[in-house]
Swiss-Prot record:
It is found in: Cytoplasm. GO terms for biological process: tRNA wobble position uridine thiolation. The gene is mnmA. SUPFAM superfamilies: Adenine nucleotide alpha hydrolases-like. This is tRNA-specific 2-thiouridylase MnmA. Its EC number is 2.8.1.13. GO terms for molecular function: ATP binding; tRNA binding; tRNA-uridine 2-sulfurtransferase activity. Keywords: ATP-binding, Cytoplasm, Disulfide bond, Nucleotide-binding, RNA-binding, Transferase, tRNA processing, tRNA-binding. It comes from Zymomonas mobilis subsp. mobilis (strain ATCC 31821 / ZM4 / CP4). ATP binds at residues 19-26, 45, 137. It is an enzyme of class 2 (transferase). The lineage of its organism: Bacteria, Pseudomonadati, Pseudomonadota, Alphaproteobacteria, Sphingomonadales. Residues 159-161 are annotated as: Interaction with tRNA.
Amino acid sequence: MSIDFQIDKPKSAQRIVVAMSGGVDSSVVAALAKATGAETIGITLQLYDHGAAVGRKGSCCAGKDIRDARAVAEKIGIPHYVFDYENNFKESVIDDFVSEYVAGRTPVPCIRCNQGVKFTDLLNVARELGADCLATGHYVRRLVNNDRVEMHRALDPARDQSYFLFATTKEQLDYLRFPLGGLPKPKVREMAAELGLSVAMKADSQDICFVPDGDYARIVEEKCPESGQGGDIVDMQGRVLGKHSGLIHFTVGQRRGLEIGGQKEPLYVIRLDPAKKQLVVGPRQALAVAKAEIKEVNWLVDGFDREMQVKIRSAAKPVSARFDGKELVFEKPEYGVSPGQAAVFYDGDQVLGGGWIKETTPAVFDDLAE
């Protein structure tokens, strides 16, 4: 199978840098780049090396992944280099992750990683190497429409990663290539097997790669011990219903773990108040949000003032909304919207841009005022 990397040069004069994580997706991208006849260089960033993650299936950019990337590079016959970006990753991703949780928000570290370490630091390395583009294994499409570069969702909706890439700038998108955006994952694994790549059936990486056991609260508490302090669980009128063991164990919309008995209806986490160490709970209806204030907005288009579709979680269905440059107003109340999450804007399959949710305004229901 051949892929057009959309480089306006003879194939023999092209140089492509591939971000190789050690997984099947980026390995196939490297093989596709090599097959074009372009000079292909594989680069892996060492982002962390937690002992528990090194041998764990589903980690990313730890020790075993680096070895897998090197083995693939040797198999397809391309040079491979490893750059230590552990300090950059800690400062721009892990520290931000911790501070957001401590502040009672819900972070999305994969977006910060793409925004900083991958599409800033690694992209700069590719430019310094004289590459014509940086290719990655992300499932998203880069299309050229009337000489304008656009980002579109992957053809396979189950694999689409556009939510995590909204912060990509126009300049970065112009330089990036995403060869797998039009392919289903089974086809990619099939291609890897046909090429004899050892990673053909390797497990996919996890969303939070630096949390080897899934216990993100432990990571936060290790970095910020006071974050594990307990406090009161209160209802929306401020009445104390119970105690919690630390706000870092909870997110907006959560039900499990509250351990509050004797209630007439199920209670959900409505809000976290770090200043008072209070966990505010209420009925599901209280989760309804009418609008959200958005910060750090990044546009991939020159302007858009019509109704759009918005995703406030990666797995959520897009919902209709309008954005005036500051406030995102939902057509219908949206549930479980948490400060710290990303709001990504779409027009059909095209990614318009997005931003970070700073504050939310609840929808008003008469029976919640009692």
